[in-house]
């Protein structure tokens, strides 16, 4: 109901006085004393009047004297409560409690009033804010001065004063709105309290408590209202993460237990020197000491270390584990890697390892160590954890955070809409009141004046009301006071607004404005439009509008004409591109001539852009030039370029050159994709403003926490983490480095710095701090950032790229050039034709014909004349181009009409051919993939429509023509008559070949050969040279496959013809592969197989598996989706490359040639600058020492290598070396110094934020958006259904798949029956679940170094649990009999029990006979499977797993595609990188020597992990990095060098394909299905409700008949749980449901389920057809036609019963009347015979007894009545009385019971159905 607003009056704001308090108290007492019969609905506080919000506009501005003083509450909800408000400056509402503060200070106490004035004063808030910021700055000082203690006391005093002010003004804790009732004040109170505790009480761990001071930074959140909103949203999102957190922790616990069982103790396996050398034995014997084996293996000198490694080399005893070098043996010794923190020895450390693995932080290190220690086969464990944990669970957190924040946004939007609606209602009421006032005023004037005066004054009144220019006019005159209307007002002419500006308000109108709730003036609108004073606008117009004289104006017009021409924009765009190209070709080293060329080019381009700016200023005048954002941007860049030219000789000014790169953003004016994406980023940054501040505060706080807690520890215990006892690069000894560590943790790299922290600062404290950083900063905040960024990618934004019809200048210029080209072509062709005809003496065609042809050809290339805006048409000079859309020359695919625009006939024919190759179903002769034309391919659409119109042609069984018409026209002998002779034989041969290649067996055979040939490629590893027999077999097999594919190709040539074969893309792929194979065989026969070119051709065979793409339906769907996404992906890739180009060129300017260093070749250590200062010193030492002047492999020496560096930084792999080199760099050819250039860290921080975070997430956004758009195009049915219908459809879909399972009958045997009752009780399940949890805890307490006693106890506990679960299984088997195996969970339990028993029995045998422990470990995993039974007890977890199950089919398809990509790249890797030097990430396990090792490496790179280490050896080109002549044992291949071009291309392309595309498709599908699962779980009915219905049905339908007795229906629906439950009394509601009742009074399962579902969801007529179809399906699945036929419905049954009740009542009344009449007759007889007596009306009178018998239901009176009546009837009748002819001598028993049963109609009661049935039968 709309609230009523009266006109605003000053008395609306009333002071809060003692009288006000007495009124509130009196009203409260009155309300308590009043007992109202009907409870009033509970009111709620108004949202717009909450504390902290601004006063709604409708109330206007309160008078100045009422600010900052207590006022009566405006909210009606608080009118009856002891509260008051204070409105501060800015009209902010502050609400206070009216009770005494601290039981002393009343609201009228001067001290409290003073505290309130201070508290609400904005200056106080600014002072506190300044104090907080100052305090934060002081806390960041590493070595505070001596007077810092005084400053600290000052801050403490200020905070104490703030708390005192708040407590005095609000009260402490008793009552609403007191100090401690606000959670934000808890922070203030705790900070101040802890400050005093740490100052005055001597505590040991003072540093930990003093860390509370850091939380003062959080006080900044309390000052800004927007930040409070963000924090509330974050807290709400964390609340909603409950189910995901539980599932994540549960999954991690299960994986942790599995990891413990598989890898416990493995990471301690090290290579120990063995056998023991004679020197050691001699030493022991000389000193007569016994040999200490433990000390020997623990001694690090006896362990094998790789160069530069901190931990000993791991190894394993499995066949596929890492091996030790000669002279070493694998033993368990020493501590675990990484200071002992990386291990699987107990639950806690294993959980940390798995948590790190799930977050993918340096997981390649854990992966490599585990596979080396346990074996390559355990890669399967990591695949499961990565795909289920990392890809699924982490992205579920992203989805939950995004949905939670979206809900907060929706709630905020709803609140704003409610306020707007309330405001509109108030405005409407004010308008009506104002009209009434105006009408009254007119009426009073009309009654006082004459007719003429009346008309005149009335007209004036109208004018005064309508035209209030410059005068205050009421808001009632504005119909819609929204921003839209205000903007419309702003669009009025300048003259009116200027007139209105200088008028003065009258005092009377001002008084009226003060008394109105909300008043607007045109002056306010003009002020909002122009914030500066009018004088400034006059001055600007006079100075910056240059129209001084005629010649200048004439010159300006011509300059305007030139500068606004599209060709000028095209020229400037080309200059921008050329300028970027000039800057990007800068490299190191450069010769002087090249450098001079670049300098000259820079000068030329700077001159051009400066001239452009000057000419545009002349053309537009400065007044208009600087009103356009792009012009301002351009002027800044030009000014900086000119400044850079002037400062070019100064040191450090090269960075200014990089700023010229920003000019590339001007391409956004003509590049729609770039424009849209820049807008998205800008909008996201704007929308994320508050979130950015909160994230910055959190980073600041955690950096301070680390600095305060661990700063000193890093200095004291530095020798623990550094060999030279110098601080490492990552430490917390100062605030800046602490900030870098927190930022690195937010980037996902935290585990390495946490190891150092735990080593110097203690495990518990470091774990707590880091976990908070990861959970709050990484998982919540950054996911929220990503979610809001993705929300900017609405379909409207990205689809607008395609739908944008606006024509820019470059398109117009391009169109002009194309039209000129076409005109020249037509002119030349026409001239030549005319000349030829003239020579031949023929008459040339008329001009009209030529003109028509030219017009027709030019029609497609024309634009309407009004393509330009009005201001672009200068002096009537217009353009003749008339095509609304055309091709953009910068990015192909941007325009909607790629294929239509501006192509000649040959281009069109080529385009048609290409489209035909992908689109025509007949032409897909080498593929079963049907090309799906996208919306951007109109040509493909047209051809698709033609195909649909001509289906008969497509179904033709005859082959097509071999050659095109042009070929036959040029070579007529190709046209063969197929009706006779050789032509007929040729035609029959073609038809036979056509039949063969079209046969399914042929296709199956070819696919089999493709798979076989692909599998053969996997065997061609480095060991093939040692297996001569296999090598010969593979060579012959390769030839056989080649011959098979040649035959296939020849058959298809003959069958399909060249035209059709070579217009199919898949056939082209097949042709290339076969051609490469033919060339390989030919070269081997000729002896040229060792040539490099031939070897490269052989690698093309790796593409053979691509041929299988078209044969698998699942991969076909994924490929089609990928093909549809390629245009969007390419656009975003180009934008990312452009963004990165800026950073790359900036890196070249900053670091080119500066990454060189002089190193010791033995240890690879950088020599100190004291020994080597520059390159010359290093060169001098090279001749005498083992030193080298080397460059970092990945550097910024040119833009290309800069791109590679940025890719490593953006994927956080290999970025440390690059960043270290950057911060150590000095000048070119100078030796680096440790962190001499420390603030270069900021370059990488800025790039990570903008270059990595934004641009890489653009891929996710684009792929998800494209995926959703394609789904909308393909899922047509969903587009035509409403949301309610979708809910119905989902619910009905579940119902359709649901079938009433047979209930397991209770056994007849007594013992089995008792056991059945026990195992089916809910208590049994709860008991077993508790045992499973205890079992899980028992498994968690296992550890590697546990004592024998603990080991025996845990073993016995395991035996006990096995016995318990075995007994449970046996009991269930006994009770449920053969039905036990009909339940899936029972089968799972049975399998777990069997495997557990086998593991228990075999464990001794396995250990006794030293069988491989792998089998034993796998069997022990069965114990963990018991834990999975907990899933069925958790509804939320089942919902999330249901989302995963929904995703499985699509994920399987993507997995197939990913496997195919990995397979192909593995073959390429084996061909090119099998023999590279073992360096970096390449070793004896992780390499490309075999197919298995290649797959292990590529799985690692799939998550972008470790690719920098694998890339490093491929960048070696020659000595001394590698040896090109080294022999590889067992092979003929020489050398171990790589190929940088191949290596960079290989790894970059794989990362883009797998990490950025395929993995993101994986993420997109999971997010999509999570949304579906959440939608279904948030529906009124979900899967659990139907399961509950099913289980309840089985309790009533014990025999599983799928029918329920009608009389049991009320009890059944009452037994259901919410929301399906229909509580008693429910018979009337069941009747209204109108369910069918079949024979024998039964109701079917489906009818009840449909009826209950419809009751919950509501009824819609659209779903009737779906109901009928589901009924038909259910009837088909359960054929019982006779029994299923409905007899009646519940509604009809109720009507019949009600009709019977009506008949019974009428009959009862009839019987009653007869009985009373009969009793009266008998009474008369009695009185006549015996005479009148007293007490006739007493209780024992006959009528009274009869009435009592009838109405009190006392059947005992029936026999006395009959005994009294019978003797009376035997007496003779009195002749004077008329006896009725017929009357009942004896009331029948049935009737008596009926009357008794249904008597007392005045008492309302619910008749039971059993009674109704008896009545019906008795009457019948």
UniProtKB/Swiss-Prot annotation:
Disulphide connectivity of cysteines: 271-324, 757-766
InterPro entries given in the database record: Ion_trans_dom (IPR005821), Na_channel_asu (IPR001696), Na_chnl_inactivation_gate (IPR044564), Na_trans_assoc_dom (IPR010526), VGCC_Ca_Na (IPR043203), Volt_channel_dom_sf (IPR027359)
Cell location: Cell membrane
Residues annotated as transmembrane: 118-138, 150-171, 177-197, 204-224, 244-264, 379-402, 558-578, 600-620, 626-643, 651-671, 691-711, 767-790, 1005-1025, 1038-1058, 1066-1086, 1092-1112, 1132-1152, 1244-1264, 1321-1341, 1353-1376, 1381-1398, 1417-1437, 1454-1474, 1544-1567
Protein name as it appears in the record: Sodium channel protein
Domain notes: The sequence contains 4 internal repeats, each with 5 hydrophobic segments (S1, S2, S3, S5, S6) and one positively charged segment (S4). Segments S4 are probably the voltage-sensors and are characterized by a series of positively charged amino acids at every third position.
A single MF term (Gene Ontology): voltage-gated sodium channel activity
Annotated keywords: Cell membrane, Disulfide bond, Glycoprotein, Ion channel, Ion transport, Membrane, Repeat, Sodium, Sodium channel, Sodium transport, Transmembrane, Transmembrane helix, Transport, Voltage-gated channel
Chain segments carrying region Disordered: 483-507, 844-864, 891-959
Coiled coil (UniProt feature): none
Intramembrane region coordinates: 347-371, 735-755, 1200-1221, 1491-1513
Comment field (misc): Available data suggest that activation and inactivation gates are located near the cytoplasmic surface of the membrane. It is hypothesized that residues 802-806, 847-857, 894-910, and 942-955 might, in conjunction with the positively charged residues of S4, act as a voltage sensor involved with the activation gate.
Extracellular topological segments: 139-149, 198-203, 265-346, 372-378, 579-599, 644-650, 712-734, 756-766, 1026-1037, 1087-1091, 1153-1199, 1222-1243, 1342-1352, 1399-1416, 1475-1490, 1514-1543
Region described as Non-homologous region of repeat IV: spans on this chain: 1490-1505
Organism: Electrophorus electricus (Electric eel)
Repeat region (I), residues: 108-410
Species classification: Eukaryota, Metazoa, Chordata, Craniata, Vertebrata
Pfam families: Ion_trans (PF00520), IQ_SCN5A_C (PF24609), Na_trans_assoc (PF06512)
Ranges annotated as biased composition (Basic and acidic residues): 487-507
II repeat start and end residues: 548-811
Glycosylated residues, chain numbering: 278, 288, 317, 591, 1160, 1174
Main function: Mediates the voltage-dependent sodium ion permeability of excitable membranes. Assuming opened or closed conformations in response to the voltage difference across the membrane, the protein forms a sodium-selective channel through which Na(+) ions may pass in accordance with their electrochemical gradient.
């Amino acid at each position: 109901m709309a609230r009523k607003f009266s006109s605003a009056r000053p008395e609306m704001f009333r002071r809060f006085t003692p009288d006000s308090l007495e009124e509130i108290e009196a009203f409260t007492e009155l309300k308590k004393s009043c007992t109202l019969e009907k409870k009033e609905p509970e009111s709620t506080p108004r949202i717009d009047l909450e504390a902290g919000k601004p006063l709604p506009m409708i109330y206007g501005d309160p008078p100045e004297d009422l600010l900052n003083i207590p006022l009566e509450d405006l909210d009606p909800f608080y009118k009856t409560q002891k509260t008051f408000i204070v409105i501060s400056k800015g009209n902010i509402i502050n609400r206070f409690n009216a009770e005494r503060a601290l039981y002393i200070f009343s609201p009228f106490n001067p001290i409290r009033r003073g505290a309130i004035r201070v508290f609400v004063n904005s200056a106080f808030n600014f002072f506190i804010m300044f104090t907080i910021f100052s305090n934060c700055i002081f806390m960041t000082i590493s070595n505070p001065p001596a007077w810092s203690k005084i400053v600290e006391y000052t801050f403490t005093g200020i905070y104490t004063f703030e708390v005192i002010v708040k407590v005095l003004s609000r009260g402490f804790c008793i009552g609403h709105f007191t100090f401690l009732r606000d959670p934000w004040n808890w922070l203030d109170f705790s900070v101040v309290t802890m400050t005093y505790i740490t100052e005055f009480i001597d505590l040991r761990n003072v540093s930990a408590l003093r860390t509370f001071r850091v939380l003062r930074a959080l006080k900044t959140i309390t000052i800004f209202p927007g930040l409070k909103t963000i924090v509330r949203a974050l807290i709400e999102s964390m609340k909603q993460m409950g189910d995901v957190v539980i599932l994540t922790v549960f999954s991690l616990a299960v994986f942790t237990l599995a990891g413990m069982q598989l890898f416990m103790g493995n990471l301690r396996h090290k290579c120990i020197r063995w056998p023991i050398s004679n020197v050691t034995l001699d030493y022991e014997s000389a000193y007569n000491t016994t040999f200490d084996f433990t000390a020997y293996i623990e001694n690090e000198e006896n362990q094998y270390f790789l160069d530069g490694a901190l931990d000993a080399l791991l190894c394993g005893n499995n066949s596929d584990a890492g091996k030790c070098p000669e002279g070493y043996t694998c033993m368990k010794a020493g501590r675990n890697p990484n200071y002992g923190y990386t291990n699987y020895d107990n639950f806690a450390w294993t959980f940390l390892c798995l948590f790190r693995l799930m977050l993918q932080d340096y997981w390649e290190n854990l992966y490599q160590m585990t596979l080396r220690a346990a074996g390559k086969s355990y890669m399967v464990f990591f695949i499961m954890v990565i795909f289920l944990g990392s890809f699924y669970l982490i992205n579920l957190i992203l989805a939950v955070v995004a949905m939670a924040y979206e809900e907060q946004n929706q709630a905020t939007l709803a609140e704003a809409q409610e306020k707007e609606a309330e405001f509109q209602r108030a405005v409407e009421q004010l308008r009506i009141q104002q009209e009434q006032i105006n009408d009254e005023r007119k009426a009073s004037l009309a009654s006082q004046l004459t007719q003429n005066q009346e008309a005149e004054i009335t007209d004036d009144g109208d004018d005064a009301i309508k035209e209030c220019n410059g005068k205050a006019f009421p808001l009632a005159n504005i119909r819609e006071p929204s921003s839209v209307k205000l903007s419309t007002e702003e669009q009025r002419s300048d003259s009116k607004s200027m007139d209105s500006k200088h008028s003065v308000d009258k005092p009377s109108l001002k008084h009226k404005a003060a008394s109105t709730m909300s008043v607007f003036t045109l002056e306010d609108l003009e002020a909002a439009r122009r914030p500066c004073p009018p004088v400034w606008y006059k001055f600007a117009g006079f100075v910056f509008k240059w129209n001084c004289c005629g010649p200048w104006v004439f010159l300006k017009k011509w300059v305007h004409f030139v500068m606004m021409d599209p060709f000028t924009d095209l020229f400037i765009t080309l200059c921008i591109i050329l300028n970027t190209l000039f800057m990007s070709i800068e490299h190191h080293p450069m010769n002087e001539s090249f450098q001079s060329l670049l300098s000259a080019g820079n000068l030329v381009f700077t001159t051009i852009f400066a001239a452009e700016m000057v000419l545009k200023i002349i053309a537009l005048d400065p007044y208009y030039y600087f009103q356009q954002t792009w012009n301002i941007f351009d002027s800044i860049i030009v000014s900086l370029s000119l400044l850079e030219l002037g400062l070019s000789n100064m040191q450090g000014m090269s960075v200014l050159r990089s700023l010229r790169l920003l000019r590339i953003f001007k391409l956004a004016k003509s590049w729609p994709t770039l424009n849209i994406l820049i807008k998205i980023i800008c909008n996201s940054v704007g929308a994320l403003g508050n979130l950015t501040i909160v994230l910055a505060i959190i980073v600041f706080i955690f950096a301070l926490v680390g600095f305060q807690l661990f700063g000193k520890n890093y200095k004291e215990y530095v020798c623990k983490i550094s060999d030279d006892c110098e601080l490492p690069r990552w430490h917390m000894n100062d605030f800046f480095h602490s900030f870098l560590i927190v930022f690195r943790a937010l980037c996902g790299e935290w585990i390495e710095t946490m190891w150092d922290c735990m080593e110097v600062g203690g495990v518990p404290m470091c774990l707590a701090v880091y976990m908070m950083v990861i959970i709050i900063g990484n998982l919540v905040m950054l996911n929220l950032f990503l979610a809001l960024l993705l929300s900017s990618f609405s379909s409207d934004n990205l689809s607008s790229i395609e739908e944008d019809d606006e024509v820019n200048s470059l398109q117009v210029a391009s169109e002009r050039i194309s039209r000129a080209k076409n005109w020249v072509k037509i002119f030349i062709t026409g001239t030549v034709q005319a000349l030829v005809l003239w020579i031949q003496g023929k008459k040339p065609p008329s001009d009209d014909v030529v003109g028509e042809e030219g017009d027709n050809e030019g029609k497609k290339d024309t634009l309407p004349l009004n393509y330009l805006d009005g201001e672009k048409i200068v002096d009537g000079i217009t353009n003749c181009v008339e095509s609304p859309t055309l091709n953009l020359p910068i990015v192909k695919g941007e325009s909607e009409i790629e294929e239509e625009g501006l192509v000649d006939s040959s281009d069109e024919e080529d385009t048609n051919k290409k489209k035909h190759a992908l689109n025509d179903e007949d032409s897909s002769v080498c593929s079963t993939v049907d090309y799906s034309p996208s919306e951007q391919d109109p040509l493909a659409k047209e051809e698709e429509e033609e195909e649909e119109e001509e289906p008969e042609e497509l179904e033709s069984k005859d082959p097509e023509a071999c050659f095109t018409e042009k070929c036959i026209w040029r070579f007529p002998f190709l046209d063969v008559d197929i009706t006779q002779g050789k032509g007929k034989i040729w035609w029959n041969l073609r038809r036979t070949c056509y039949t063969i290649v079209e046969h399914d067996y042929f296709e199956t055979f070819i696919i089999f050969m493709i798979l076989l040939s692909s599998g053969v490629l996997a065997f061609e590893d480095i060991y093939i040279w040692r297996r001569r027999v296999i090598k010969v077999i593979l060579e012959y097999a390769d030839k056989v496959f080649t011959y098979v594919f040649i035959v296939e190709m020849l058959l298809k040539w003959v069958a399909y013809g060249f035209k059709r074969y070579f217009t199919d893309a898949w056939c082209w792929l097949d042709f290339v592969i076969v051609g490469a194979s033919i060339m390989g065989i030919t070269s081997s026969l000729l002896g040229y197989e060792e040539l490099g070119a031939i070897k490269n051709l052989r690698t093309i065979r790796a593409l053979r598996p691509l041929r299988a793409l078209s044969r698998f339906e699942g991969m076909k769907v994924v490929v089609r989706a990928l093909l549809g996404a390629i245009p969007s992906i390419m656009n975003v890739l180009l934008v990312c490359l452009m963004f990165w180009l800026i950073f790359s060129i900036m890196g070249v300017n900053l670091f080119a040639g500066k990454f060189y260093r002089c190193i010791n070749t033995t240890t690879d250590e950088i020599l100190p600058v004291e020994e080597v200062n520059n390159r010359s010193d290093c060169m001098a030492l090279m001749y005498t020492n083992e030193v080298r002047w080397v460059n970092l492999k990945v550097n910024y020496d040119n833009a290309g290598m800069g791109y590679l560096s940025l890719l490593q930084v953006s994927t956080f792999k290999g970025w440390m070396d690059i960043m270290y080199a950057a911060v150590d760099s000095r000048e070119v050819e100078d030796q680096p110094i440790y962190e001499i250039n420390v603030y270069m860290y900021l370059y990488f921080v800025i790039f990570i934020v903008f270059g990595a975070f934004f641009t890489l997430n653009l891929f996710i956004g684009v792929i998800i958006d494209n995926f959703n758009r394609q789904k909308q195009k393909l899922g047509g049915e969903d587009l035509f259904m409403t949301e309610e219908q979708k809910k119905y459809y989902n619910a009905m879909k579940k119902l359709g798949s649901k079938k009433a399972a047979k209930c397991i009958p209770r056994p007849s045997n007594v013992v089995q029956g008792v056991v059945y009752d026990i195992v089916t009780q809910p208590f049994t399940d709860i008991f077993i679940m508790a045992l499973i949890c205890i079992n899980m805890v028992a498994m968690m307490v296992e550890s590697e170094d546990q004592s024998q006693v603990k080991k025996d106890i845990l073993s016995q506990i395991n035996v006990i649990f096995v016995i318990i679960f075995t007994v449970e299984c046996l009991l269930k088997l006994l009770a449920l009999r053969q039905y036990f195996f009909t339940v899936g969970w029972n089968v799972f339990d049975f399998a777990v029990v069997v495997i557990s028993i086998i593991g228990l029995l075999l464990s001794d045998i396995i250990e006794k006979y030293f069988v491989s422990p792998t089998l034993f470990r796998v069997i022990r995993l069965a114990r963990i499977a018991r834990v999975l039974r907990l899933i069925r007890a958790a509804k939320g977890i089942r919902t999330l797993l249901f989302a995963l199950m929904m995703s499985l089919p699509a994920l399987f398809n993507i997995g197939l595609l990913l496997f195919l990509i990995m397979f192909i790249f593995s073959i390429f890797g084996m061909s090119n990188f099998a023999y590279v030097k073992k360096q970096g990430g390449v070793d004896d396990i992780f390499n490309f020597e075999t197919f298995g090792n290649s797959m292990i490496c590529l799985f690692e790179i799939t998550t972008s992990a470790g690719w920098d280490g694998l890339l490093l050896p491929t960048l070696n080109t020659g000595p001394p990095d590698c040896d090109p002549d080294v022999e590889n044992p067992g092979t003929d291949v020489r050398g171990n060098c790589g190929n940088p071009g191949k290596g960079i291309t290989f790894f970059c392309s794989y990362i883009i394909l797998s990490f950025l595309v395929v993995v993101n498709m994986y993420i997109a599908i999971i997010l999509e299905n999570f949304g579906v699962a959440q939608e279904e779980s948030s529906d009124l009915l979900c899967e659990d409700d139907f399961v509950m219905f099913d289980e309840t049905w089985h309790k009533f339908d014990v025999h599983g008949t799928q029918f329920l007795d009608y009389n049991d229906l009320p009890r059944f629906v009452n037994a259901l749980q919410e929301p399906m439950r229909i509580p008693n009394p429910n018979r009337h509601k069941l009747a209204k449901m109108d369910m069918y009742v079949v024979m024998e009074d039964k109701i079917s399962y489906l009818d009840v389920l449909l009826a209950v579902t419809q009751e919950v969801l509501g009824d819609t007529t659209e779903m009737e057809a779906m109901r009928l179809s589901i009924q038909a399906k259910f009837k088909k699945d359960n054929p019982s036609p006779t029994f299923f036929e409905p007899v009646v419905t519940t509604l009809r049954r109720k009507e019949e019963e009600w009709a019977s009740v009506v008949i019974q009542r009428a009959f009862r009344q009839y019987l009653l009347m007869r009985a009373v009449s009969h009793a009266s007759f008998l009474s008369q007889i009695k009185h006549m015979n015996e005479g009148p007596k007293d007490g006739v009306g007493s209780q024992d009178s006959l009528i009274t007894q009869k009435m009592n018998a009838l109405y009190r239901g006392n059947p005992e009176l029936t026999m006395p009545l009959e005994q009294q009546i019978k003797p009376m009837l035997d007496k003779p009748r009195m002749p004077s009385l008329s006896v009725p002819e017929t009357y009942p001598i004896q009331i029948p028993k049935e009737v008596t019971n009926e009357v008794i049963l249904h008597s007392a109609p005045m008492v309302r009661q619910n008749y039971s159905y059993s009674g109704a049935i008896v009545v019906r039968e008795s009457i019948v």
